[in-house]
Amino acid sequence: MSSEHIQNKLALLPDQPGCYLMKDRQGTIIYVGKAKILKNRVRSYFSGTHDSKTQRLVQEIVDFEYIVTSSNVEALLLEINLIKKHDPRFNIRLKDDKTYPFIKITNERHPRLIITRQVKKDKGKYFGPYPNVYAANEVKRILDRLYPLRKCSTLPNKVCLYYHLGQCLAPCVFDVEASKYKEMQDEIVAFLNGGYKTVKNDLMKKMQEAAENMEFEKAGEFRDQINAIETTMEKQKMTMNDFVDRDVFGYAIDKGWMCVQVFFIRQGKLIERDVSQFPFYNDADEDFLTFIGQFYQKANHIPPKEIYLPDDVDSEAVQAVVPDTKIIVPQRGNKKDLVKLAYKNAKISLNEKFMLLERNEERTVGAVERLGEAMGIPTPSRVEAFDNSNIHGTDPVSAMVTFLDGKPSKNDYRKYKIKTVEGPDDYATMREVIRRRYWRVLKEGLPMPDLILIDGGKGQIDSAKDVLTNELGLDIPVAGLAKDDKHRTSQLLFGDPLEIVPLERNSQEFYLLQRMQDEVHRFAITFHRQLRSKTGFQSILDGIPGVGPGRKKKLLKHFGSMKKLKEASVEEIKEAGVPLNVAEEVHKHITAFNEKAKNTEQK
């Protein structure tokens, strides 16, 4: 739609809260946002200047819709549902759930204690999340020793080892009262909510009583249980002096990016954190609210008893998302320090991201720019590198890889089977490949490279330049990569006459050339091996009576490789679906071939 159409719609926007849906040329919803005042927010996209990522969004907008709500809170809830429904590609996309393990008491007649990563609305009791399965298993192991709930997923018809160990009440054989299960479940809930110290004190009394009664084996069992509680439940530093489950949020923004850190505090301990980074398009606090709304829509993010938020966040809106959780914006003390710590970690995470981006820029785009400067040519943003591969002239192939701004562009890689060259002639092979590649580039109007790299020296470079200039009328810089006696990149040859381009061996531009040469060599060798494997298999079977193209294919499919066929017996060859007499001929032929190869090696 025209910009006039958008301007007309902008003039009609109301001074009310609501959600807006941006659409592209196909009518696809590409972004959903919310606003306290729709008129101001939506108009801001089409006026003033924006950073590059917002500009990319605006360039794709050809239409928009909006929905008025009665409040900002209602707008937040609607936005969450619209994002969930349409999954717009410019909205915050939380990474796939890192599914943390939970301990669960199942809602069954004879309940079990299990570890699960799936949180369902099945009336089971869930505790966690735990930072990893090992930590969850450690806690479960203690509970199994203290509370003998059943272990079997289906009830057997006789007692198992757990019954004899005192870790199961054997409901498969004995009647167990529901009140007994309720008592154990209540104690487990208390234990996991921080009441393990009471359990520990009870065990210490029992241990002392057993020791006084000379029941040393029983006292030893109590001692082991106490040790398990101490090492598992008390080994982590306490972050709070109570046992309330909390999620602590902090966020930082920089260069159009937001990082949100969530600290999971369970039973007073910081057990894990969640880190999310994403570009944001609205006000930071608005996108932060959107993040929280989406965060608790995830099945494995169970809202805790309390959520701590930084200042200037609309706590009323968050409360609407998680109505059963207490929302706190701490003003002082340990709670405030935790929010500050989450912010500090978010800021560090963003700084690290940009430092890594700068380093990556240095080794890619920066290296390409300096390579062009060293060669005296414009920045070679698109480089196409070639390498030939053959063994004594058999199955000659060539390969081309493409690097865009210093990064491999694998969709632009190409393989070539050499058609016109007989025997090992590297120069003629290079001429054929350059001719085929750039004749097609001209014919189909494909992007021209800024630099062609040849794996070789003067002869290969001259062959490529001759075809480009005299046959195709192209003027593309051609350089050669020479290797030392250890087959490592040693120097770059360029110019007329050819000269060594002075590059520091520890420079990023030299490392870039190494990566290009290694990549094209790998690609060519891999293609050549694939070709040899296929043609080698078929050539050995050529001339065997009763083995035509169909049976060659059948043998290839059955054995998969020449090595396996060489090791096969007559009976094994017959299992490939060929008659006995043909299997005998194949075995006889391969045995003779193996003997001949062995004698050749000995000579």
Swiss-Prot record:
Q: Which Pfam families match?
A: GIY-YIG (PF01541), HHH_2 (PF12826), UVR (PF02151), UvrC_RNaseH (PF22920), UvrC_RNaseH_dom (PF08459)
User: What start and end residues bound the annotated signal peptide?
Assistant: none
Q: Which SMART domains match?
A: GIYc (SM00465)
GO BP annotations of the record are:
nucleotide-excision repair; SOS response
Where would I find the GIY-YIG domain in this sequence?
15-92
User: Which residue ranges does the record assign to the UVR domain?
Assistant: 197-232
Q: Would you say which domain of life the source belongs to?
A: Bacteria
Q: Which GO terms describe its molecular function?
A: DNA binding; excinuclease ABC activity
Subunit note: Interacts with UvrB in an incision complex.
Q: Which PANTHER family match?
A: UVRABC SYSTEM PROTEIN C, UVRC/OXIDOREDUCTASE
Q: What does this protein do?
A: The UvrABC repair system catalyzes the recognition and processing of DNA lesions. UvrC both incises the 5' and 3' sides of the lesion. The N-terminal half is responsible for the 3' incision and the C-terminal half is responsible for the 5' incision.
Q: What is this protein called?
A: UvrABC system protein C
Naturally occurring in which organism (per UniProt)? Listeria monocytogenes serotype 4a (strain HCC23)
